[in-house]
Amino acid sequence: MEGKAIATSLGGDRVLIFPCSPRSSFVFTSRLSSLPLKRASIGGAVSCSGVNGLTRWNSIVSTRRLVPVRSINSESDSDSDFPHENQQGNPGLGKFKEYQEWDSWTAKFSGGANIPFLMLQLPQIILNTQNLLAGNNTALSAVPWLGMLTGLLGNLSLLSYFAKKREKEAAVVQTLGVVSTHIVLAQLTMAEAMPIQYFVATSAVVTIGLIVNCLYYFGKLSKTVWQLWEDVITIGGLSVLPQIMWSTFVPLVPNSILPGTTAFGIAVAAIIMARTGKLSEKGVRFVGSLSGWTATLMFMWMPVSQMWTNFLNPDNIKGLSSITMLLSMMGNGLMIPRALFIRDLMWLTGSLWATLFYGYGNILCLYLVNCTSQSFFVAATIGLISWIGLALWRDAVAYGHNSPFRSLKELVFGP
């Protein structure tokens, strides 16, 4: 976007020049923010590096959020690693208050997801502690450390994704997932249910990952180091995902590490080609988005794996807790409005999938085998439908759309 200049006479032959943006392109919000660029702004005014063109021109306004009124195809759009990032709709001036309010509420909902997710993990941590103190190490063997490790790697990858997008609330949710899962793995190692060498390696990766993401979020990390970290999690995610999908169907398929090793080779080759300029700009952006998508697909595969287990062993479903599934549905559901509001297709896909198929899907299975009451199932159904309907309606109001389906259209195809 080309800047304009306002010249103010100081008397004599001196003139003070203030650079500014086109008049109709931006409005200043009244709300101050200590991190004014922590969230993606509409129209691509904020790049992934979190630097806004206007704040580079004039430091006087650097503490005020800038929200574009119109969609502008800026240069920062082409630099984004994420499909449809920064492609939000365009709230008119008359709807700007609703836009601000819903922006604030969706951020609070996203941060509130910490509560149900913490309640999901906390009982397991307490139970493991009680068994360890009682010397009942065998009980901890029932907790699958490999599945926990996979979830931890997924949380770590998504933490990097949200840290790059400056989505503070979502990043905190993923950080909580990393820390709580690591505590469980530590307990399993103490009970000798997890090999200590794997735990040491995992601890090193977790420590490095948390430090790198924290430094990057606060602008204290070089681009080269961050890019190296992204390459590592991309290779790790692409290697683990096919192996998990293959292992789900063992013994119907041979037990083999071929899917993981093949994917590892492809991932390394893709990274090398991207960093040596062998890929087009579109290809480089695609490779850059893989870590987030593979992490999302890991979590999306969890309900598939659970449904497959329920199909093979219907009696096992009685071991599921309806409260646990409800908490899972609530945690993922709370992030749906924010993902829709910032037009993040990857985030919305993962959250909606987990809400419908992992949380609500297992509640439905429990109801079908008479493991939960009809009133509980009806309440969960009405609550879910109402919440999704509310998210679509308020998003349409915030952006000044006549139909909530326009929000979904913008999410997939852009404004």
Swiss-Prot record:
One of its GO terms (biological process) is maltose metabolic process. It is found in: Plastid, Chloroplast inner membrane. One of its GO terms (cellular component) is plastid. The chain crosses the membrane at residues 139-159, 176-196, 199-219, 231-251, 252-272, 286-306, 322-342, 345-365, 373-393. GO terms for molecular function: maltose transmembrane transporter activity. It comes from Arabidopsis thaliana. Expressed in leaves and roots. Expressed in root cap cells. Keywords: Chloroplast, Maltose metabolism, Membrane, Plastid, Plastid inner membrane, Transit peptide, Transmembrane, Transmembrane helix, Transport. It is a multi-pass membrane protein. PANTHER family: MALTOSE EXCESS PROTEIN 1, CHLOROPLASTIC-RELATED. This is Maltose excess protein 1, chloroplastic. It comes from the Eukaryota. Its main location: plastid. The gene is MEX1. Residues 74-93 are annotated as: Disordered. Probable maltose transporter. Essential for the conversion of starch to sucrose in leaves at night, probably via the export of maltose from the chloroplast. Required for root cap cells formation.
